[in-house]
């Protein structure tokens, strides 16, 4: 599978030789907003809500996964795609299929800091969606941190809806948010 999106980049299946380049990408980001979780336990009812909160200053956040995790993801992958320009990797997406074969789970959707806002993430997500269609998976789910407001906005812009969270999901104990989209089969 190779898709040419412009003269700027190509999306293709990753090879093991792409891993070092993926690991070299600067995946940090800056944000002025986060999703803050509010939990209320009143008279036997637990209510959980998220709200957008503006931070007092710009916050730089490092990618939540350890580099060794990408090698493990490569070994366990169902789908691993890269976006490249002139043979240089600019971003990647890693997806696995859940045990019930009902969900294409995007664990990593990453674009190097210098290459953002050039539709690379959109192209990677579009190829992941096509892959899920071909695999006859009815749902595509993307995970991101509550701190990753740019990632949250990206998911919402692409029609994914908030469908859940997991407290202390990442190694650094950040909360994971899950955004999903039904796949037309």
Where are each of the predicted segments found?
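Acetyl-CoA-dependent GNAT
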Residues: 16, 24-107, 112-113, 125-127, ...
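Residue-level recognition of the GNAT/N-acetyltransferase active site
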Residues: 112, 143-145
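Conserved acetyl-CoA-binding loop-helix of GNAT-fold acetyltransferases
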Residues: 111, 117-130, 134, 153-157
